[in-house]
Amino acid sequence: MNLTKKFFRVIAFVLFAVIALQLPVVALARELQPGITDNAISTTLSGDDAHILSEDATLRDEYTKHFVLSDGSMLAASYSVPVHYYKNDEWKDIDNTLVSENAKTGSDIRGFVNTESGVKYKFAQSSAEAALLEMTADGYSVSWELVADKNMVAASVTNPEEQNGNSDDDILNGNKNISSVKYINILNDTDIEYILRGNDVKENITVKSAKDNYTYSFRIRVSGAALVLKEDGSIDIVKGGETVKTIPAAFMTDAAGAYSADVETTLVTESDGVYMLTVTADKTWGNNAQF
């Protein structure tokens, strides 16, 4: 009797992760299932039986909000994903709600951009665009193109849920710092998903059937910076001789939570500012399907 194996494998990249935020990046890499995950919140309450009146924005940092309570005490809420970005000498709310935007120039893509953040991300409205992802920050930009015989698919966007209530839970969970874009079956039995969390984005390649190989290539165009491949498979984005961001090494997970770092990464310079990134996941591990 023939049995059909039902499984998926995920090859994941944490893209454009700020070097200074290695701990959040490590935590993200341990989230083995694809999709949006909730903010983890820890709170420190200095009073009992009180409710939130307002936020004291002067006490903000990247991960923390402080709330004034009805009894005059304070509540500090710390989040696992950045909720603020720094601009013009103040911490502002991150809003990663994705909204439609047409191409601004001849080389731009039509897609969806995050509303307010220290980093601008734009995701293609469909696989027909010249790139799946564009990132702009601090005087440089990076675009990310899947080089393959792609199927024609539209982007599936998941935005943060609106919190319209005034309860303490609504206020504490009202951040809009996580969203996602998925290209379902952009390759045969393969999805590509981008999860935007704070100022970082994670790419999941979800493989839903066994393949002859697990090799994926991306053309990366960089303006105002350069890419440097490290021995551990990570890639530094270097500007003015300094590493400003990094793309950590790819890894694999499956539906059962198994993990493997057996992924080969190559980076070839095609021309000035244009690179070909190729990742090849271990075939034996990839074909070891779970029932």
State each model region's role.
Residues 30-291:
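Residues that cap or anchor secondary-structure elements
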Residues 19-28:
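C-terminal segment of classical bacterial N-terminal signal peptides
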Residues 1-4:
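N-terminal hydrophobic targeting signals that begin at the initiator methionine
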Residues 8-12, 27, 33:
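Sequence-pattern detector for short linear motifs
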Residues 6-7, 23, 163-164:
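Intrinsic disorder/low-complexity segments enriched in polar/small residues
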Residues 6-20:
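Sec-dependent N-terminal signal peptides
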